[in-house]
From Swiss-Prot:
Top-level taxon in the UniProt lineage: Eukaryota
Disulphide-bonded residues: none
Keywords, in A-Z order: Coiled coil
Organism: Mus musculus (Mouse)
Protein name according to UniProt: NEDD4-binding protein 2-like 2
Coiled coil among keywords: yes
Coiled-coil spans in chain: 162-194
GO biological process: blastocyst development; in utero embryonic development; negative regulation of hematopoietic stem cell differentiation; negative regulation of transcription by RNA polymerase II; positive regulation of hematopoietic stem cell proliferation
GO cellular component, one term: nucleus
InterPro entries associated with the record: NEDD4-bd_p2, P-loop_NTPase
Lineage: Eukaryota, Metazoa, Chordata, Craniata, Vertebrata
GO molecular function: enzyme binding; transcription corepressor activity
Positions with biased composition (Polar residues): 564-575
Region described as Disordered: spans on this chain: 69-169, 555-575
Basic and acidic residues biased stretches: 69-87, 129-142, 149-167
């Protein structure tokens, strides 16, 4: 819709002026002329229809003297139009059809009296489009976000790198610790590096062999252990260790998986009122075991090994290494305290206390080469001692357990593992052709009879010799242990591993000789659970057996004798 053409009407003095759209009073587009206005006869309107179908109207007042109020009104109405569209431009107000305007010179009358004009130019506020501003803001925001993201990524990358470095450092430290532990274990297990050459000349093989021969003639065991040739000589028969005229090979190149039974150190004999001494036999250890054994190395079930369904207390210790003369029955035991004398093939022994022929001793090898070749000599000594123990295959087994616990079944299993074994039981004394008859008055004779049989078997070299008694207390086994040690036997303590072996109610049902639950409970009260050779050898037979062990009732007397007759019962059907 074209802009509204406003006409100012003069109604006379005191009248209000009205404004109407001029297009209502226009004639048709074909008529070109001047039409009078309502304001007076002197005012004409020139209309012309342009090509763009717009009607341009220009109102000219030919009489400037007439209607000053009208001029004022018309100029006031057109003020905004003149501000926005200047008259000197093509898009400004133009008077079409007027001769003054056709000449190109604006009429002075048209400047103030012009009412309305149209233009092709857009009339509106001048401002910059908001899109550029928004784009700039968005761009700045994206730049900000991208910078923040890049910073964050850099921080995360730095953190990840730092974590990776920390992990690498920890892993390297962990591997270093593992290597150190492995090195320590290898150092404790044996020397894997050749000993540094000392200032002394290297010992040749021929010289060492000559030394060994002279030492064997003198039967000096300590010097044999100091010599490296001892290692070569005892390995001559082994296929993996040829003996030639070369220097002794490094020990790290040789593995010894064929070592036979585990050798354990033991405590020496001590009197009951003195503490057990720390006994370090031969000053060497087996790989992976502590160099100095703990004082409680000999415990009943803690040190036992599971074998054939039972706990086996294996004591392949220094007692098996004693090689006494068969005709010399403990002749060297009559000594006083604080005396030093040669003992055990050249080993210096200092007696600290003596009781019943058994003394507490400390053995010290005088080995000057131990300071220079400590690891090597320890290994040689260990090998030599184990080879010596392996030759001692003779074994004494002492069974322990309450009546009905399964000792007899265990003795049969152990006997079946050896062709030359034999079983002795004090209970056999009361077996006759017409049956079993127990007599408490014959209990002492029964014990002596059983001990004599065991001694004869040991003298003959039978192995294993199995003693099938209850053996609830240590002093009851002392005679058997003494004779076994005197002949170089190993001593082991075995117990049947049955779930009822300490249950008096179940034991009452399972034993064959009618031992009551009350009597079994009394035997269980005095049962010594921890047992070892040192405990047995330091035990003392009670002097008042009648007070400590009251005589049982009829049918139960076979466990109330003076020599530990409760150790007679060993019958059990099965486990």
């Amino acid at each position: 819709m074209p802009y509204s053409e406003v006409e100012a009407k003069f109604l006379g003095p005191g009248k209000e002026q009205t404004r109407e759209p001029c297009y209502k009073k226009l004639k048709s587009a074909a008529d070109d002329g001047v039409s009078p206005l309502r304001g007076g006869p002197d005012i004409h309107r020139i209309q012309e229809k342009p090509r763009n179908n717009r009607v341009a109207v220009a109102t000219i007042n030919f009489r400037r003297r007439v209607c000053p109020q009208e001029d004022k009104t018309s100029t006031d109405v057109l003020k905004p139009l003149h501000k926005e569209m200047p008259g000197d431009k093509l898009g400004g107000s133009e008077s079409i059809g007027s001769p003054a305007l056709q000449d190109g010179k604006p009429s002075p009358l048209a400047k103030d009296d012009e009412i309305y004009s149209t233009s092709k130019a857009f009339i509106g506020p001048i401002y910059k489009p908001p899109e550029k501003k928004k784009c700039r803001e968005r761009k700045s925001e994206t730049d900000t976000f991208s910078s923040i993201d890049s910073k964050r990524r850099q921080e995360e990358k730095q953190k990840s790198n730092s974590k990776k470095l920390e992990m690498d450092t920890e892993l390297s430290q962990f591997y270093k610790e593992i290597e150190e532990l492995e090195n320590e274990n290898e150092a404790s297990q044996g020397s894997c590096t050749e000993p540094e050459p000392s200032e002394e000349p290297i010992i040749s093989y021929d010289w060492a062999c000559n030394t060994l021969k002279s030492e064997e003639e003198n039967k000096d065991l300590s010097d044999v252990l100091q010599s490296h040739c001892g290692y070569q000589e005892y390995l001559e028969d082994e296929p993996d260790y040829p003996c030639d005229e070369q220097l002794m090979p490094a020990f790290c190149e040789t593995s010894f998986p064929s070592f036979r039974p585990e050798w354990q150190s033991m405590h020496p004999f001590v009197i009951p009122h003195d503490p057990l001494s720390s006994f370090n036999y031969f000053n060497f250890q087996r790989f992976g075991t502590p160099l100095h054994p703990s004082p409680d190395v000999f415990h009943g079930r803690d040190d036992s090994q599971m074998q054939n369904g039972c706990y086996v207390d294996s004591y392949q210790d220094g007692w098996s290494c004693l090689t006494f003369d068969q005709n010399d029955e403990y002749a060297n035991y009559d000594v006083t305290s604080n005396n030093v004398h040669p003992f055990r093939n050249g080993c210096s022994v200092q007696d600290e206390s003596v009781n019943n022929g058994f003394c507490e001793i400390r053995e010290c090898w005088q080995d000057p080469s131990m300071d220079k070749h400590n690891e090597t000599d320890r290994f040689v000594n260990q090998w030599f001692q184990e080879e010596k123990l392996n030759k001692l295959q003779k074994l004494l087994i002492l069974l322990r357990g309450l009546p009905g616990s399964g000792k007899t079944t265990l003795s049969r299993i152990l006997l079946g593992q050896s062709r030359d074994g034999i079983v002795f039981s004090t209970d056999d004394y009361f077996h006759h052709q017409d049956g079993y008859r127990y007599n408490v008055n014959q209990l002492g004779d029964a014990h002596d009879w059983n001990q004599n049989r065991a001694k004869q078997a040991i003298d003959q070299g039978r192995s294993p010799v199995i003693i099938d008694n209850t053996n609830t207390q240590a002093w009851e086994m002392k005679p058997y242990v003494e004779m076994a040690i005197g002949k170089g036997y190993r001593v082991e303590f075995h117990e049947p591993e049955t779930w009822w072996k300490f249950d008096p109610e179940e034991l009452e049902k399972r034993n064959k000789h009618g031992v009551s639950r009350k009597k079994i409970a009394q035997m269980l009260d005095r049962y010594e659970f921890q047992m070892s050779i040192s405990i047995v050898m330091n035990s003392v037979e009670p002097t008042q057996k009648s007070i400590q062990r009251p005589l049982p009732l009829e049918g139960e007397q076979r466990w109330g004798g003076s020599l530990g007759s409760h150790s007679q019962v060993s019958i059990a059907d099965d486990y």
